[in-house]
Amino acid sequence: MREIVHLQTGQCGNQIGAAFWQTIAGEHGLDGSGHYTGSSDLQLERMNVYFNEASSKKYVPRAVLVDLEPAALDAVRAGPFGQLFRPDNVVFGQSGAGNNWAKGHYTEGANLVDQVIDVVRREAEGCDCLQGFQITHSLGGGTGAGMGTLLISKIREEFPAGMMATFSVVPSPMVSDTVVEPYNATLSIHQLVEHSDETFCIDNEALYNICMRTLKLTNPSYGDLNHLVSAVMSGVSTSLRFPGQLNSDLRKLAVNMVPFPRLHFFMVGFAPLTSRNAYSFRAVSVPELTQQMFDPKNMMAATDFRSGRYLTCSAIFRGKVSMKEVEDQMRNIQNKNSAYFVEWIPNNVQTALCSIPPRGLQMSSTFVGNSTSIQELFKRVGDQFTAMFRKKAFLFWYTGEGMDEMEFTEAENNMNDLVSEYQQYQDASVSDGEEEYLEDEQLEGEE
């Protein structure tokens, strides 16, 4: 079987991770202690992608929980599914990273990282055929961003063939915890461009907007935001966990979604959107799901895809859905919005079906898009970074941990390059390719 080892680092990563495990344990028919109480063989068929079967029919998540202070991990273990995790897989320090990327990446985190890699190695050795890793973390803090990216690069060295997927929460100006978020995020993106294979960008601002506008929650809690994120994570991993018509593993997803290796930052969306307490009482149809899924208001990254173009996208439908209806609807959307899809990548929209819907819903759809409009998100962080870096504000927090200003400049340049690469492919057209091809032909002819 194609197993995935899951890591969650920092407070944000652990809270999202806990919500994810709660969601998929429910979908696979597991109770809070990991015993199977479900009714369908389909739930068991690919259970061991994410779970190890221990003695006495107990299933244990292949998860490694990491933090530089014990508080968030204690909260996870005291939660409803806290008994699920293997106690040896919980690794924590005492000092915390104090929202400082350098502490997570170079000092405090570096002291703890070998211990974490030992746990990861043990989990990987328990797999028959490891397909890769997924990590949940935020890019604005110290542990998730600094230590999270350190772990990614260490795992890359140790398991070069494994895929690396990250669920990364990008800081947003509306929902800001600390003043140095732009530094932490830019330094992290610099790492992710090089070391990650696929990064699902989640944005607190977009999540807040969804909660306020669509779900009509007056003051959303982090629990509500995490509920949305876990719905998307569960949707993205559906085709890995259940048998379906288009069984993508992490590598197939990357092959279908990433046309150029550096451009692996995805926008995600989910439909139908429901709040935690009110599962939808009306039946949804495939046209409605498709419409909602492509709606900019449903995207969990605060960018508008209408300001860019899709290089590739993938939709995962769950529930009793007919393949033909889905294909028709997806074709319909493409025809109506053809300006928003690049024409030089043929068949750039994939659809996958899975017959098991999420809990409490008749059917649902999850959307993953590789759109050039994601550059808005990097620009936003980059502008804030530049404004602070020009004045060298708060730099001493980082240089004090042994970092050099040069690293900041490199990270800034790398992010600017990423933005201009997205822009280049947004502007590219079929004729550009043909002209280059003709020029090459002429040159060959002249030779």
From Swiss-Prot:
GTP binds at residues 11, 69, 138, 142-144, 204, 226. Mg(2+) binds at residue 69. SUPFAM superfamilies: Tubulin C-terminal domain-like, Tubulin nucleotide-binding domain-like. GO terms for cellular component: cytoplasm; microtubule. Its main location: cytoplasm. One of its GO terms (molecular function) is GTPase activity. It is found in: Cytoplasm, Cytoskeleton. Its cofactor is Mg(2+). It comes from the Eukaryota. Tubulin is the major constituent of microtubules, a cylinder consisting of laterally associated linear protofilaments composed of alpha- and beta-tubulin heterodimers. Microtubules grow by the addition of GTP-tubulin dimers to the microtubule end, where a stabilizing cap forms. Below the cap, tubulin dimers are in GDP-bound state, owing to GTPase activity of alpha-tubulin. Dimer of alpha and beta chains. A typical microtubule is a hollow water-filled tube with an outer diameter of 25 nm and an inner diameter of 15 nM. Alpha-beta heterodimers associate head-to-tail to form protofilaments running lengthwise along the microtubule wall with the beta-tubulin subunit facing the microtubule plus end conferring a structural polarity. Microtubules usually have 13 protofilaments but different protofilament numbers can be found in some organisms and specialized cells. This is Tubulin beta chain. It comes from Trichophyton rubrum (Athlete's foot fungus). The lineage of its organism: Eukaryota, Fungi, Dikarya, Ascomycota, Pezizomycotina.
